[in-house]
Amino acid sequence: MIWKRHLSLEELNATSSSTLVAHLGIVYTRLGDDTLEAEMPVDNRTHQPFGLLHGGASAALAETLGSMAGYLMTRDGQCVVGTELNATHHRAVSQGRVRGVCQPLHLGRQSQSWEIVVFDEQGRRCCTCRLSTMVLG
């Protein structure tokens, strides 16, 4: 397991109350040895005007996962901030839920890079994101 902080899924989800994460319905669902996963509903909160999953909602899911994964890689007195997010949208989703899977690409002392892949309920890749973060403190 790569994580330096050890939080349960309940504790991870509790950090999101009264935030954009909670408003979008994002819920952390799995903490693996080197992966963090979350789900987000595809509904009126996350749709764009034409009834499809908004690209910004996919980006919010990705940044949420990458930032929390980055935080789990820090020690007391440190925090993580996003510095760049890239998202490539592959497939439209109109309903159901999407699942984001976050894995590290680079874990340095001051910078991190994360890949977040968003899948639909059929397991098809809908969006691929890369988040760069900076470790502060």
UniProtKB/Swiss-Prot annotation:
Compartment(s) of residence: Cytoplasm
Hydrolase is among the record's keywords: yes
InterPro entries tied to this protein: HotDog_dom_sf, PAAI_dom, Thioesterase_EntH, Thioestr_dom
Predominant localisation class: cytoplasm
UniProt keyword list: Cytoplasm, Hydrolase
Active site: 63
One of the GO biological process terms: enterobactin biosynthetic process
Homology family: Belongs to the thioesterase PaaI family.
HAMAP family in UniProt: Thioesterase_EntH
Protein name: Proofreading thioesterase EntH
Organism listed in the record: Enterobacter lignolyticus (strain SCF1)
Gene: entH
